[in-house]
Amino acid sequence: MALERLKEFAQPYFALMPRVEMRQHGAHFLEGILTDLERKSVEPIAERLGESLRPLQYFLGESPWDHQPLLDKLCQRVRECLGDENGVLVVDPSAFPKKGTQSVGVARQWCGRLGKKDNCQVGIFLGYVSNKGHTLVDERLYLPAVWARSKTRREKCAVPKSVRFRTSSQLALEMVRERGRILPHRWVVADEEFGQPYRFRKGLDRMGERYLLEIPSNLLVLDLAKMPSVDGKTNGPRRALFQQVRRWKDGLRPSSWTKVHIRDGTKGPLKIMATRTRVQSYDMRRQSKKSQWLMV
């Protein structure tokens, strides 16, 4: 059974917990979240598995155990099994709809699964992909500012004092920095939630990372190949010279596009029309001083 295989896989990680009862609670909770329960909180899980409620609550919310050694072991295992110098680190957010309001970080925020703002928790995840396979290697729970500032909420859910508000970009950079030291990789990729913010791109630059990031079509860019000369000494191109990516694309000549063979599909070769140019970006009232490749 899949559950038995998962328990076997998880055993070395539970073994890192300092006490026997912690290992047992961990195994029970893992089993509980894989059930068909509508509400997969502590109470329904304890009832379904016939476990005492309070010990399981204490294990999840108050007991002082460090999850970092488990993630470190997972990362080492991934390196052994999937590591490749051409590997890719994948940053991806995911939201989890919640019916209640007591779980840590629950707030009315964008939920991609529902396609709208709703009551949910948001996690930032880091995956690893190589030609040998793919898996998740790290995660961070996004704590909204309203939670980070609330002493009452923090105390009720036992949020550690060291945890402060950080943007999703800051959380992602932290994971890339920590796991990138262990996992061999050539690229970092992410969707437009991370491709748009200037600070995320700048953070990757500072770490010396190569990256491929999705950006929104309304991001302002300056095509350096078409930049007009600017007389006199200036601090850089004026804001008025920048245009949205979609407008820049619409103004290209047919000769600017190149047919690119992506892969062979079941119905024959998959080809796209693509183009690229060096640009500077302008977003969040900030102009990037570094030029980057824009690929469309």
Predicted feature locations:
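Domain-level cores of phosphate- or acyl-group-handling catalytic modules
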Residues: 153-232
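Electropositive nucleic-acid engagement tracts
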Residues: 18-22, 28, 32-101, 200, ...
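Short, contiguous clusters of charged residues that form electrostatic/catalytic patches at enzyme active sites
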Residues: 28, 72, 121-124, 170-177
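An anionic, glycine-rich sequence signature occurring as long contiguous blocks
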Residues: 7, 132-157, 161, 165, ...
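Short, glycine/acidic-rich beta->alpha junctions
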Residues: 37, 70, 118, 192-196, ...
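Active-site-proximal, Lys/Arg-enriched surface segment
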Residues: 62-145, 277-291, 296
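Structural motif
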Residues: 18-25, 113-119
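Basic, low-complexity segments
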Residues: 1-18
